[in-house]
């Protein structure tokens, strides 16, 4: 066990069984099958699969279901009995206790997708032994998974962020394949609003550097996206695979360097979904993908890039409230790239176990909750606006109030007022990609009467930072990027080293600095902060939008 989780063990079993069973089917060699069977029998003999944390059960059930189905002919009758009994008694039945219905059954996050898919795999694998049980589990999944599929609506941006898109979506596409393969229908799961569009979301949330726009609980390192192979086949869209095919060699090196290999536990499924003709066609599509993209929803995302090349200018911004599943205090947060360098960074999530083992109340999402004191989860670790260094409010909608994909300055504008309602009456953030080669981040606010909070604009970077007047020069990897505080001209600019842990439970952030721009809000007054960015000084003054955000149409 790792804390309260057996998940790393379940994932190790899934990794081994899926890879070995795939090798056995391709090679026909008995040695792969027998090793997979040994893994299955060992897991089947566990006392239980830790139903107190049902993700562990779901992934273990999936592992044994795949092995039972794919290696059925290699299993002896006695081995089939052992594995099938474990699937039913340790995988499925604990979820059917009428006195204690697991919370995930009706949840709206990735647990729903993972658990229902894993148990459906088990139920279908052993359906000949208990048809009524299989029918019950399948019917439950078809009824309940749409609750979580709402996370894609309306345009594909997954509420829990890019990393958990990979987790929840992997299991949902497996569930669809199971239903179609066995029952001939998908239960309507692919018709969920935004579900198919979420493939475009992952494409857009991958920056020119190859890193993720890693808002919420996510890492910047983009893993090999196995589900995209399913989407590419489903939609006949080989362009979706451009990044993964280009980085395949690097992905394999990373996989081999990871002892548990759990990061690639579903890798063989890419082989099943791969279409050989895509190899010739996948390079023909990238230029047809949009340069400017918006997804509305509970956690809206706006993306703007100058091209699909590796040196493109790229800025992506997210809304959303911190109390969302796997949310951070990052409403209005952004990442920024140019010349192949990520200049504005999100340091990413901190592993749960590292916090839980030290007693951090990680899932307390109240405004005063301990979750928001963790550097990487709270306001300190994000590129956001703050008032008197206070945290954002954890609840509230952040709607898109403006978006444009053409003209001299394609842009996204978010209404972040709900996140600062205790100190302001209105807060908007707009980001624009200017045709002259620059970007503009413009914030506008109205402080409440009787209050005069200090406004702080903050941006995290791993670049070397130098200040001169109202200009900031970033240097990294032999490249340079310029920031200019255009308005107001008298704002205070400072740079703080945030590489060392703030609290005993925080992890280090090597090379990380925070740029802060400070000014007074003014009681009851409307305020504005305009910050320009570009790779050259000349681009800072070319085709820049002027005026309030409301006039950017």
Name each model-derived stretch.
Residues 1-4, 290-293, 298-301, 440-441, ...:
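Beta-sandwich/jelly-roll carbohydrate-recognition scaffolds of carbohydrate-active enzymes
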Residues 2-212, 218-219, 428:
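Aromatic-lined, polymer-binding surfaces characteristic
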Residues 56, 111, 164, 325-331, ...:
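Histidine-centered active-site/metal-ligand motif
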Residues 64, 119, 304, 443, ...:
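A residue-level signal for conserved active-site and pocket-lining positions in enzyme catalytic cores
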Residues 74-77, 293, 474:
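Replace the tail clause
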Residues 103, 126, 167-344, 402-409, ...:
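Carbohydrate-active enzyme catalytic cores, enriched for enzymes
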Residues 249-258, 262, 354-553:
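CBM-like, beta-strand-rich accessory domains located in the C-terminal region of large
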Residues 306-379, 527, 533:
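Terminal accessory carbohydrate-recognition/targeting modules of carbohydrate-active enzymes
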């Amino acid at each position: 066990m790792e804390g309260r989780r057996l998940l790393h063990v379940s994932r190790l079993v899934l990794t081994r069984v899926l890879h070995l069973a795939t090798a056995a089917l391709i090679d026909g060699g008995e040695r792969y099958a027998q090793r997979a069977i040994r893994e299955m029998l060992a897991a089947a003999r566990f006392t239980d699969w830790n139903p107190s944390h049902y993700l562990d059960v779901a992934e273990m059930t999936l592992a044994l279901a795949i092995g039972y189905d794919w290696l059925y002919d290699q299993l002896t009758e006695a081995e089939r009995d052992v594995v099938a009994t474990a699937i039913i008694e340790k995988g499925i039945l604990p979820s059917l206790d009428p006195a204690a219905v697991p919370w995930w059954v009706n949840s709206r996050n990735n647990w729903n997708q993972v658990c229902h898919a894993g148990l459906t795999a088990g139920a279908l694998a052993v359906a000949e032994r208990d048809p009524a049980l299989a029918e019950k589990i399948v019917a439950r999944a078809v009824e309940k998974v749409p609750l979580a599929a709402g996370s894609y609506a309306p345009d594909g941006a997954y509420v829990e962020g890019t990393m958990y898109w990979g987790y929840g979506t992997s299991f949902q596409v497996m569930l669809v394949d199971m239903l179609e393969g066995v029952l001939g229908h998908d239960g309507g799961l692919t018709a969920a609003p935004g579900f198919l569009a979420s493939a475009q979301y992952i494409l857009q949330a991958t920056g020119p550097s190859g890193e993720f726009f890693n808002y919420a609980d996510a890492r910047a390192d983009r893993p090999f996206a196995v589900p995209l192979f399913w989407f590419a086949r489903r939609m006949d869209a080989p362009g979706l695979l451009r990044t993964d095919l280009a980085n395949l060699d690097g992905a394999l090196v990373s996989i081999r360097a990871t002892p548990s290999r759990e990061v690639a536990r579903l890798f063989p499924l890419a082989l099943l979904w791969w279409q050989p003709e895509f190899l010739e066609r996948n390079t023909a599509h990238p230029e047809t993908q949009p340069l400017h993209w918006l997804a509305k929803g509970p956690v809206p995302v706006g993306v703007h890039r100058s091209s699909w090349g590796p040196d493109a200018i790229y800025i992506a911004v997210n809304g959303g409230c911190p109390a969302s599943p796997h949310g951070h205090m990052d409403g209005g947060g952004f990442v920024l790239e140019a010349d192949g360098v990520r200049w504005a960074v999100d340091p990413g999530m901190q592993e749960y176990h590292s916090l839980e083992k030290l007693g951090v109340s990680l899932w307390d999402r109240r405004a005063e909750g301990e979750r928001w004191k963790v550097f990487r989860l709270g306001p300190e670790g994000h590129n956001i606006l703050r008032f008197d260094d206070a945290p954002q409010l954890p609840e509230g909608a952040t709607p898109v109030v403006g978006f444009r994909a053409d003209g001299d300055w394609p842009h996204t504008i978010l209404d972040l007022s709900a996140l600062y309602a205790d100190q302001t009456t209105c807060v908007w953030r707009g980001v624009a990609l200017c045709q002259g080669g620059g970007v503009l981040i413009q914030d506008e606010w109205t402080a409440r009467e009787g209050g005069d909070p200090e406004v702080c604009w903050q941006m995290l970077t791993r670049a070397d930072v130098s200040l001169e007047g109202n200009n900031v020069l970033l240097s990294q990897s032999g490249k340079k990027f310029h920031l200019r505080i255009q308005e107001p001209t008298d704002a205070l600019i400072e740079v703080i080293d945030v590489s060392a842990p703030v609290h005993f439970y925080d992890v280090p952030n090597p090379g990380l600095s925070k740029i802060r721009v400070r000014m007074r809000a003014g009681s009851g007054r409307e305020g504005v902060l305009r910050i320009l960015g570009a790779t050259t000084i000349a681009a800072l003054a070319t085709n820049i939008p002027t005026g309030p955000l409301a006039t950017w149409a």
